[in-house]
Amino acid sequence: MVPIAGFFTDAAAGTLPGYCLVEPDYGAQSEENPQNIAVGEEFAAKVVNALIDGPAWDRTLLILTYDEHGGYYDHVPPPRAIPPDSIPPAVPAGESAYDGFGRYGFRVPFAVVSPWARRHHVSHRVYDHTSILKLVETKWNLPALTFRDANATAMLDMLDLRRPSFASPPELAQPLAVTDPSALSCSVTGPGTIPPPGSVTG
């Protein structure tokens, strides 16, 4: 584990390890309510730009995702999932385990940034966080850790490994400065519309 400055130094030198996990300072750089989304977006942009501008861009894959949905509404019910093992969740007496570990949570944003990412591609496959493990296991020929990652999809449909779509890094729009008043205000002036009862099925 190294401070984030070490990531930026290694990205600039092309000396990042084969796999690394980048986490923001959740107390300051989270995009989750009630924090300033612009600060989190600025951090993500710095990470993406460090990889694009680095000498190892041609062999880079960044998976940008989130640990959970942040409490925001999702009209799609979580689907069933393969439990990772046969061990039930430990819950206090009298509390329900609901579906145990046999159901996914709500959807989270997920993007692949790489010269090998398919241009304009939106995957319609079900992925979960163990899909990242599955991709790592596939790349380095490693055994699965649980039943869930053994049965996960490795996200290869998002990549074109025959030819890079972004051999020359794309020009990205710069995020609004966190001091820009328009970056600090919400564009919604009132509550959103709630779907009528029975209109959302799953």
Pin down the residues of each PLM region:
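N-terminal pro-sequences and low-complexity stem/linker regions of secreted or lumenal proteins
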Residues: M1-G202
